[in-house]
Amino acid sequence: MLKKLYSKKGQVSMEMGILVASAVAVAAIASYFYAVNVKYSDTHAGETAKNTSNALINVTENVCGNISEITIP
């Protein structure tokens, strides 16, 4: 009877160890991808800012170019 009891405790302990090890592995993988995305986010942010700035400049130039064509009835 004691042998069964100890073996069940060992089984539960091993299962808990596997569960904790799995959680640590998932956290390590997630943190790696987070770090990679943070590392390259500044490059993409700069490109996005340039594209937005160029689009606003184009709109402004179009509107300013059409100011002389405005007529007041």
UniProtKB/Swiss-Prot annotation:
Residues 1-10 form a propeptide. It holds the Pfam family Class_IIIsignal. A motif (QXSXEXXXL) lies at residues 11-19. It is found in: Secreted; Cell surface; Fimbrium. This is Probable minor pilin MMP0528. One of its GO terms (cellular component) is extracellular region. It comes from Methanococcus maripaludis (strain DSM 14266 / JCM 13030 / NBRC 101832 / S2 / LL). Induction: Expressed under standard laboratory conditions at 35 degrees Celsius. Its main location: secreted. Keywords: Fimbrium, Secreted. It comes from the Archaea. Contains an amino terminal motif QXSXEXXXL, which is part of a class III signal sequence. The N-terminus is probably cleaved by the prepilin peptidase EppA, which recognizes the class III signal sequence. Disruption phenotype: Disruption of the gene does not change the piliation compared with the parent cells.
